[in-house]
Amino acid sequence: MIRKAFVMQVNPDAHEEYQHRHNPIWPELEVVLKSHGAHNYAIYLDKARNLLFATVEIESEERWNAVASTDVCQRWWKYMTDVMPANPNNSPVSSELQEVFYLP
């Protein structure tokens, strides 16, 4: 498994709405994530800084990257644009984090 972590932002007035939209995520999005090899996906909110920290274990970079081209992912990104900064293609603005420590 490949461990990934990344950081995103959430609008200051949208913390509750962001959480509401993820509890639960759309069933079809869950199916796509799992069928593309995503496991143990978690997102954490830092309310003081309006930051979201995400971790996910993936089976391959290729399968993970393929999620972005699915219809359900495209619809999800568009759905989330009013609660978080987005790129021109509606994907969330995010930065990958470098792992500096891991205790198995």
Curated annotation (Swiss-Prot):
GO BP field: rhamnose catabolic process
Reactions catalysed according to its record: alpha-L-rhamnose = beta-L-rhamnose
Compartments in which it is found: Cytoplasm
Entry binding sites for substrate: Y18, Y41, W76, W77
InterPro entries: Dimeric_a/b-barrel (IPR011008), L-rhamnose_mutarotase (IPR013448), Rham/fucose_mutarotase (IPR008000)
Gene3D superfamilies listed in its UniProt record: 3.30.70.100
Pfam families from the UniProt entry: rhaM (PF05336)
Keywords carried by this UniProt record: Carbohydrate metabolism, Cytoplasm, Isomerase, Rhamnose metabolism
GO cellular component, one term: cytoplasm
Function: Involved in the anomeric conversion of L-rhamnose.
Family label: Belongs to the rhamnose mutarotase family.
Record's protein name: L-rhamnose mutarotase
Species per Swiss-Prot/TrEMBL record: Escherichia fergusonii (strain ATCC 35469 / DSM 13698 / CCUG 18766 / IAM 14443 / JCM 21226 / LMG 7866 / NBRC 102419 / NCTC 12128 / CDC 0568-73)
Chain's gene name: rhaM
